[in-house]
Amino acid sequence: MHIKISMTQQTLTLLDNFGGIKAKYRISTAANGAGCQKNSGCTPLGNHIIRAKIGADAAPNTVFVGRRATGEICTPALMAQFPNRDWILTRILWLSGTEVGVNRLGNVDTMQRYIYIHGSPDCTEMGKIGSHGCVRMRNEELIALFDMVEAGTSVNIVNE
């Protein structure tokens, strides 16, 4: 299986080894568009793998900071209390680039930029740009995807 993320369509498609579609989801990528530079706030293009899966047993809407569950569950009240927090919820699929000089090592390293596929608050609009570089998904859809992929699964992010 492998994942294709289309930035122009704002979709994530899970494909089987023969190219058949297993699942397709609306997502939200970076408000700053595509780019691989450190501190750009962009979603990196190119070939990646899922380096780590985090949060396998976490409840939906579990809040993560620094890839660790905080013990909080995201609610409208919590969001009002911390209006500037970038909400990383439910599960994390941590991406690592595989193309040296494009999205791996130096100032373009996807993993060192902490680029994830992660859950987001229910009020987050999908199908539109809006993240700080990560790929945002609906929590229930992320749980389904998380359960279908393994660490090492290839992820291709394209600007088409």
Regions found by a protein language model. Give the residues of each.
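N-terminal post-signal-peptidase region of extra-cytosolic proteins
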Residues: 1, 26-40, 73-79
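Extracytoplasmic
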Residues: 7-9, 22, 45, 88-90, ...
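Short beta-strand segments
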Residues: 21-25, 48, 113-115, 135
